[in-house]
Amino acid sequence: MTALRFPLLAAAASLSLAGCWYSSSVSGSRDGTNTMRAIDTANATTSPQQAEAFISGKTWRSTESSSGQHIHYSAPDGRDFAWFRGEERILAGEWRIETATDSRGQAVTRLCLRYPGETVHPISKTAGDQWYCRAAGSVFHGIPERANGDVLGLAGRTQAPFALTLSNLTIAQLKARANPPANR
């Protein structure tokens, strides 16, 4: 009887404690709870109009990728020009905003990117012509900086101005390095 009591007690305890990490009232921001709640809120409340306004006609810098930052210019007509770490050229692709259903059946606004000229999509590692879509709030959480217009001239370039590294440079730092003043 004693041998059965402890495994049953352990099983009951683990079932009752499952999921406490995320919903614990004593959790602080160090464990990621506040960040996850902010992303969940952004995913639930970002409208398609807000998502489009966030990136349309903007140069934006994403730092969420484990492979380092990537820089985009998302033109208002749906074209996307992307500069990825390790790439010697600017990738020409497309962006769109769509509404889909999440795992709980709730409507969620998504940002989708694809690069039809590429064999492999630089983010998802699937076929380049396949749309890679993520909840807009999640994507925007990893974008620390945006600038109006094509401030790095990505739409007019085929070659990257220099190789991006793992270090996160600001848009101003990237611009200064990509377009150095002429020597006099």
Model-derived segments and their meaning:
Residues S16-G19:
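C-terminal motif of bacterial Sec signal peptides marking the signal peptidase cleavage site
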